[in-house]
Regions:
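Short glycine-rich, Thr/Ser-proximal phosphate-binding strand/loop in the N-terminal lobe
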Residues: 11-62
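Phosphate-binding/catalytic loop of phosphoryl-transfer enzymes
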Residues: 2-6, 110-115, 123-126, 130-176
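Short beta-strand-loop/turn "lid" adjacent to the catalytic site in phosphate-handling enzymes
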Residues: 60-119
Length: 176
């Protein structure tokens, strides 16, 4: 029998307080949460993130260094979660890393839509030994979306019901 593989999800929000990590297994009609953790983001890295997010002119060097630092932090969060759940890298189907959004300009609001997340997924893959899937927002924008592809698909899968109507509130960074 082939045991179900685990998936790890990593993200940090607009508050930049921590990296949230979750280990999951998916069945046909169920999601099994195997473990979670919040991994703190050091103050110096937070300062860099806010600088990259808020200033019109940014340093390419700061962007590259912060991208690398966050890649290391996301890796550490994934490894900490794997250890706390006793999950080996070969049991992981994939790690999904949202990264840290520093700029987001979806279609319809800007002449040239774009989105930029940092937290190098190559570092996460190298440190964990797992396949990493990332850059969700830019892929969604490239296909004509608003750069938020995961939440609607997740909500539809988890909350759909043949006979009941449901409303889901997602006010990004405020009430997810």
């Amino acid at each position: 029998m082939n045991p179900k593989k685990f998936f790890i999800g990593l993200m940090s929000g607009t508050s930049v307080d921590s990296i949230d990590a979750v280990a999951l297994q998916f069945g046909r009609d169920e999601v099994n949460i195997c473990g979670t953790c919040s991994y703190p983001i050091p103050t110096a890295v937070k300062t860099s993130i806010f600088s990259l997010s808020e200033q019109n002119e940014i340093s390419i060097e700061l962007l590259c260094k912060t991208d690398t630092q966050l890649g290391e932090l996301f890796s550490q969060a994934a490894i900490e979660l794997m250890l706390s759940c006793s999950i080996k890298p070969q049991q992981i189907a994939a790690i999904g890393s949202h990264g840290q959004t520093i700029r987001h300009a979806p279609p319809g609001q800007h002449q040239i839509p774009y989105s930029k997340q940092i937290g190098d997924p190559n570092i996460i893959a190298a440190r964990t030994g797992c396949m990493v899937v990332a850059d969700f927002r830019r892929a969604d924008i490239a296909h004509g979306g608003q750069g938020a592809p995961l939440v609607p698909a997740f909500h539809e899968q988890i909350f759909r019901h043949r006979h009941r109507h449901r409303a889901i509130i997602n006010i990004g960074g405020i009430a997810n």
